[in-house]
């Protein structure tokens, strides 16, 4: 198979979808890999390293898209990339289609086989290709929150861990999954007072076990969320429903109850956000805005700021799936691997992931049916 890896063009997105080790794995399996010039530089990987591993460097993204049967990316294509799609092409990347009607339409119009990292799901309901970036985003959310709590950043001037004789910051984490757990690890490590809310009592019990009395766990409901948000110095939104828009769990009234200079980091922004006052996606160049005196951070590609770590963490997990697709063809690969079948979001002009179809009021065709049509 002909594999194409274009350079990421999202604001300050420095990750790349393949490493030299990945190139070598494809080449040894009999495939050809084409990489856009400079695609790896943001992750400190040179074109020369790719060439040494067996890749061919192409000058432009257009050449990569024109040549490749399967495009492997990190982030969802932006509008300027839609025109590069080749009918029937395989696209393997984070898609986050639920809040992206234009991208969804473009994939359907060009009959793209869209396989989304974030909906590849194992039998135990875990999301293996979302996990590494969720771990990084969760950890970074606390670092970022601590930064924006500083006075020169517009925050209330609170040190997350406090000092002897002065109480630490209140960190409230809504959602106790992979993102929330990793956020809690860093917040606890920095000495903050941490509250985690989740709808799953078994998950709360697990969090109690691993953190002990270092965190407070609460059932996630509107009453408990409102009470926790009011006292939060740092609020982190970590809610995920695989493939679907994130539910708005924190209302505008709740945000209004927060003290001026408090900080919100919504890690769920790439699925539409879980905070009602998060009304826009921000960028690494311009990451925050203020609303009701509260600093809002809504960058959709948080791990892109630590690109080298993120690239290697991501590709460790995506490469085996990408090789399955290349070795067997997408159809056989998804038939043989139920986890990969869950990743299939679009096929032959049809939406094959129910949450995406619901988000855009489009007809839903089960993936198994679409494969046989």
Curated annotation (Swiss-Prot):
GO terms for cellular component: cytosol; plasma membrane. NAD(+) binds at residues 134, 178-179, 198, 220, 239-240, 267-270, 280, 299-302. Disruption phenotype: No growth on either stereoisoform of alanine. Its EC number is 1.4.1.1. It is found in: Cytoplasm. The active site is at 96 (proton donor/acceptor), 270 (proton donor/acceptor). Pfam families: AlaDh_PNT_C, AlaDh_PNT_N. GO terms for molecular function: alanine dehydrogenase activity; nucleotide binding. GO terms for biological process: alanine catabolic process; L-alanine catabolic process. It is an enzyme of class 1 (oxidoreductase). Its main location: cytoplasm. It catalyses: L-alanine + NAD(+) + H2O = pyruvate + NH4(+) + NADH + H(+). Keywords: Cytoplasm, NAD, Nucleotide-binding, Oxidoreductase. Pathway: Amino-acid degradation; L-alanine degradation via dehydrogenase pathway; NH(3) and pyruvate from L-alanine: step 1/1. InterPro entries: Ala_DH, Ala_DH/PNT_CS2, AlaDH/PNT_N, AlaDH/PNT_NAD(H)-bd, NAD(P)-bd_dom_sf. Substrate binds at residues 15, 75. Homohexamer. Trimer of dimer. Catalyzes the reversible reductive amination of pyruvate to L-alanine. This enzyme is a key factor in the assimilation of L-alanine as an energy source through the tricarboxylic acid cycle. Belongs to the AlaDH/PNT family. This is Alanine dehydrogenase. It comes from Methanococcus maripaludis (strain DSM 14266 / JCM 13030 / NBRC 101832 / S2 / LL). The lineage of its organism: Archaea, Methanobacteriati, Methanobacteriota, Methanomada group, Methanococci. The gene is ald.
């Amino acid at each position: 198979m002909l594999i194409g890896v274009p350079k990421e063009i999202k604001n300050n997105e420095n990750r790349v979808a393949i490493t030299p080790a990945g190139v070598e794995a494809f080449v040894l399996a009999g495939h050809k890999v084409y990489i856009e010039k400079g695609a790896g530089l943001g992750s400190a990987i040179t074109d020369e390293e790719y060439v040494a591993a067996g890749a061919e460097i192409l000058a432009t993204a257009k050449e990569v898209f024109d040549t490749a049967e399967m495009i492997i990316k990190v982030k969802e294509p932006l509008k300027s990339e839609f025109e590069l799609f080749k009918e029937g092409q395989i696209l393997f990347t984070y898609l986050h289609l639920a809040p992206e009607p234009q991208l969804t339409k473009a994939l359907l119009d060009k009959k793209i086989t869209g396989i989304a990292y974030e909906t590849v799901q194992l039998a135990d309901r875990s999301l293996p290709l979302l996990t590494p970036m969720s771990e990084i985003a969760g950890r970074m959310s606390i670092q970022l929150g601590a930064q924006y709590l500083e006075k020169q950043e517009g925050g209330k001037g609170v040190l997350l861990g406090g000092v002897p004789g002065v109480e630490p910051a209140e960190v409230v984490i809504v959602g106790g999954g992979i993102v929330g757990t990793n956020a809690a690890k860093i917040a606890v490590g920095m000495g903050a007072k941490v509250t985690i809310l989740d709808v799953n009592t078994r998950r709360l019990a697990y969090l109690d076990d691993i953190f002990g009395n270092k965190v407070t766990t609460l059932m996630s409901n509107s009453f408990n969320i409102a009470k926790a948000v009011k006292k939060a110095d740092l609020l982190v939104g970590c809610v995920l429903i695989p493939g679907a828009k994130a539910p708005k769990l924190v209302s505008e009234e709740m945000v209004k109850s927060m003290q001026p200079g408090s900080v919100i980091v919504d890690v769920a922004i790439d699925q539409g956000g879980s905070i009602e006052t998060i009304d826009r996606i921000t960028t690494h160049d311009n990451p925050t805005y203020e609303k009701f005196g509260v600093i809002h951070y809504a960058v959709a590609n948080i791990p892109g700021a630590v690109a080298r770590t993120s690239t290697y963490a991501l590709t460790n997990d995506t490469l085996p799936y990408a090789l399955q697709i290349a070795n067997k063809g997408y159809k056989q690969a998804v038939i043989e691997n139920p986890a990969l079948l869950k990743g299939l979001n679009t096929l032959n002009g049809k939406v094959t992931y129910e949450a995406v179809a619901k988000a855009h009021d489009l007809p839903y065709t089960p993936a198994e049916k679409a494969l046989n049509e």
